[in-house]
Amino acid sequence: MAKIKARDLRGKKKEELLKQLDDLKNEPSQLRVAKVTGGAASKLTKICVVRKSIARVLTVINQTQKENLRKFYKGKKYKPLDLRPRKTRALRRRLNKHEESLRTKKQQRKDLLYSIRKFAVKA
């Protein structure tokens, strides 16, 4: 089996990808048998290519799955932890813009009564 490209896999449906994954997973055992029985040299180096192909298929499956989950949870209030943006603990606990802008009644009254004075400098 030739080297599989990820861009070719992205257009396929999930069922096709799973079928291809099963085919690829069966291949290394056959190649190992060929290695023990003294098969051709081309088959010996093929194990590495097959392993990488399995990894590519799994990567594409996982990426499409995560992409679909992102679409599903877009605009919802609660999201799974792995879909939330990666932030430090301190950033997660920080006040948001709305909470920072809130003022107490006393502060609002003070701002209203004693606004900042603006002076014009005479040249």
From Swiss-Prot:
Alphabetized InterPro entries for the sequence: Ribosomal_uL29, Ribosomal_uL29_euk, Ribosomal_uL29_sf
Per UniProt, which keywords does this protein have?
Cytoplasm, Ribonucleoprotein, Ribosomal protein
Q: Record's Gene3D superfamilies?
A: 1.10.287.310, 6.10.250.3450
Compartment(s) of residence: Cytoplasm
Which superkingdom does the taxonomy of this entry point to?
Eukaryota
Database matches in Pfam families: Ribosomal_L29 (PF00831)
Q: Name one GO molecular function term.
A: structural constituent of ribosome
Q: What positions belong to coiled-coil segments?
A: none
Share an example GO biological-process annotation for this protein: translation
A GO CC term assigned to this protein in UniProt: cytosolic large ribosomal subunit
Main localization category? cytoplasm
According to the record's subunit comment, the protein's assembly and interactions are: Component of the large ribosomal subunit.
PANTHER family the record matches: 60S RIBOSOMAL PROTEIN L35, LARGE RIBOSOMAL SUBUNIT PROTEIN UL29-RELATED
Outline what the protein does: Component of the large ribosomal subunit. The ribosome is a large ribonucleoprotein complex responsible for the synthesis of proteins in the cell.
The family line of this record is: Belongs to the universal ribosomal protein uL29 family.
User: Entry's NCBIfam families?
Assistant: L29
Identification of the protein by name: Large ribosomal subunit protein uL29
Record the organism. Platichthys flesus (European flounder)
